[in-house]
Amino acid sequence: MPDVHALLSASSSKQWLHCPPSVRLQEGFPNESSVYAAEGTFAHEVCEYKVRKYLHERVKRPQSEEYDTEEIEQITDVYAEFVISIIEKMKETGCEPLVFVEERVDYSHIAPSGFGTADMLIIGKDENGKGLIHVCDFKTGAGVFVDADHNSQMMLYALGGLAAYGFLYDVETVRMTIIQPRLDNISTCEMPVSELNEWAESIKPIAVMAFE
């Protein structure tokens, strides 16, 4: 998993969209890791391994004496099974979906120097044969329920995915799903690309303010 972060990262977008000056104020402070962050990183690596294995890629399972627990196995299964079900449903439409695992996406056309890493981008066709991009994000936390509804992190990932690959299936619809197994939360938000682009235009001035 990439560990480089943009100043206007998607994961911190809720903060910089609501308080633009905070980005530069915090720039000099080091990022402090934690046990929870380390566990989350390992769980994401296991998720990546399981999906890549399904895709018949040659991969080695990540190892951790501390974090490789039965619970991690269970919650990563929830994620992998959900993602695989999306891919299989798209295949039923007659298309071969494009699947991008831990994909770096660039949304610098919206937020200066903006980029991030999407856990999963799946591009293909929906149930009606229309172009669709589905963005999935895995959350290991159990303290705060994360809703996909108009989630700025997910919307920025979707914008980056559209900019890079949207033309391949003439994407008309965006779906964004948060998978948070410890809270039994699988939350999905769907919107037309036109709505996503309207939101993107509305946040451009805020992003510039935060960056400067």
Regions found by a protein language model. Give the residues of each.
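Mg2+/Mn2+-dependent nuclease catalytic core
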Residues: 95-211
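Metal-dependent nuclease catalytic cores that hydrolyze phosphodiester bonds in DNA/RNA
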Residues: 1-133, 175
